Amino acid sequence: MADQIEIQRMNQDLQEPLAEIMPSVLTAMSYLLQRVSETNDNLSQKQKPSSFTGVTKPSISIRSYLERIFEYANCSYSCYIVAYIYLDRFVKKQPFLPINSFNVHRLIITSVLVSAKFMDDLSYNNEYYAKVGGISREEMNMLELDFLFGIGFELNVTVSTFNNYCCFLQREMAMLMKMKSLFLEPSSFKISSKTKLVMYPHEEDSLSTHHNKKQLAAA
């Protein structure tokens, strides 16, 4: 309880700085997810059947899909970083289900849904997220459950873990811009100063293994 109070106090100080970096963070997330998806599309891998895998690739880009979620979900800034952490946990625990163009959209909407429910005091229900994500409520319910089992119900995120991932995403974006290898357009994400930021850390994670080509932090 004391840790939660300390984190909530810290969130008040983090709110404005986090608002400033969120456009870059979200753009980096879009780029990294697309890069991982395209890389795994070209790999010959044995992949187990999954509710996340679609028959065809969605026509909407990862960038546009994340923009749509950001526009309509109205969840706290931290939810997107925590969703990224959850996705990284998912690919580590599910080595035979790498992120690719056939499952990345469903994984994104589900990770944000789970993150918002865990992080925020108030969040939209599954039916609303299903409409935002372009799927049915029944499918959203199934994806949520499968995702929770996929990450072993490991929802807690420590402050240090959150900060590490946030810094990683910022560094990735800065490096991409410096190398002029970022092919996405400048961010169009708009940040509201009224968004509440809440975190509930209970564990320590490590970024030491984030260089596997199937993982989100892969180079």
UniProtKB/Swiss-Prot annotation:
Tell me which Gene Ontology terms the entry assigns under biological process. cell division
> Which cysteines in this chain are paired by disulphide bridges?
none
Q: Which CDD domains match?
A: CYCLIN_AtCycU-like
Where does this protein have coiled-coil stretches?
Answer: none
| Keywords of this entry | Cell cycle, Cell division, Cyclin
GO MF term set: protein kinase binding
Q: Organism's domain of life? A: Eukaryota
What family, per the record?
Answer: Belongs to the cyclin family. Cyclin U/P subfamily.
Tell me the protein's name.
Cyclin-U4-3
Q: What is the lineage of its organism?
A: Eukaryota, Viridiplantae, Streptophyta, Embryophyta, Tracheophyta
Q: Which gene encodes it?
A: CYCU4-3
